[in-house]
């Protein structure tokens, strides 16, 4: 059983929903990022999605795209992102870490080398936005050999054939994209999302986690009624806007504190569902 699978099993036994924050590796500074990961866990994260900085992030909205630019400007590469995860693992051996990124940086490193680095660093899941499930079989198998889950996206516009392929190849959990568009998009129709999640649950036993458009405790709780977990990215990442790797430690700490305040709100809202 992988660390992701074990975490969801524990949450299910406790009748709890997974809170999964998304942060960009090395944003705003690689020096503060390990502390950020530990703080997210202290403030209720059940697992963490870590973005891999990339120069052409087609699915990222402006907030997350700017986070990637800040990380790249600070020198955070895919190799350094993995080194950060490895550093995090020195003190935390239980919180699952999922890498979310694009295919190009992985191909530059090489599939085998990338998977070996993930295993060595303690990565639990990989979500490659632009790797079609139909072309992922070999990659999925090689990840699985190291107890790493391959996560896939489903959205309101996913065609039936692709949906079937996702069900076949996905492990850990399914990331359901609640909105058409890019990360940080606006309105969230919780009833429509709920209907979609319930329909997906008829087709798979995998946990369903919903991301895109969750901004506060109210929207997290509304989605948490249907989903097994919620993923929150832009609402957290936006706190680092205007900062960089050259910013004062005090300014980064202030932004990080704002993120933790939001985490507390989200955690309390989700826990209230099982109270």
Swiss-Prot record:
GO terms for cellular component: cytosol. Its EC number is 4.2.1.20. Transmembrane segments: none annotated. Pathway: Amino-acid biosynthesis; L-tryptophan biosynthesis; L-tryptophan from chorismate: step 5/5. It catalyses: (1S,2R)-1-C-(indol-3-yl)glycerol 3-phosphate + L-serine = D-glyceraldehyde 3-phosphate + L-tryptophan + H2O. The keyword Transcription regulation does not apply. Keywords: Amino-acid biosynthesis, Aromatic amino acid biosynthesis, Lyase, Tryptophan biosynthesis. SUPFAM superfamilies: Ribulose-phoshate binding barrel. The keyword Lyase applies. GO terms for molecular function: tryptophan synthase activity. It holds the Pfam family Trp_syntA. The active site is at 49 (proton acceptor), 60 (proton acceptor). InterPro entries: Aldolase_TIM (IPR013785), RibuloseP-bd_barrel (IPR011060), Trp_synthase_alpha_AS (IPR018204), Trp_synthase_suA (IPR002028). PANTHER family: TRYPTOPHAN SYNTHASE ALPHA CHAIN, CHLOROPLASTIC, TRYPTOPHAN SYNTHASE, ALPHA CHAIN. Tetramer of two alpha and two beta chains. The alpha subunit is responsible for the aldol cleavage of indoleglycerol phosphate to indole and glyceraldehyde 3-phosphate. Belongs to the TrpA family. This is Tryptophan synthase alpha chain. The gene is trpA.
